[in-house]
From Swiss-Prot:
Disulfide bonds: none
UniProt source species: Glebionis coronaria
Induction: By phytoplasma infection.
InterPro entries listed in its UniProt record: Osmotin/thaumatin-like_sf
Family in the record: Belongs to the thaumatin family.
Protein name as catalogued: Thaumatin-like protein 5
Coiled coil stretches, renumbered: none
Amino acid sequence: ANFDIINQXPYTVXAAASPGGGRRLETGQSXXLQVAPGTTXAAI
């Protein structure tokens, strides 16, 4: 599965996923997260 995370807030956010780590997103920036088939536990 693919997830697109987009910061629509007027301030910087720290987007995180486990497993996968984190990323700083400025206003309007996005990050893509790919989750492998068969993944049984994850958090965004």
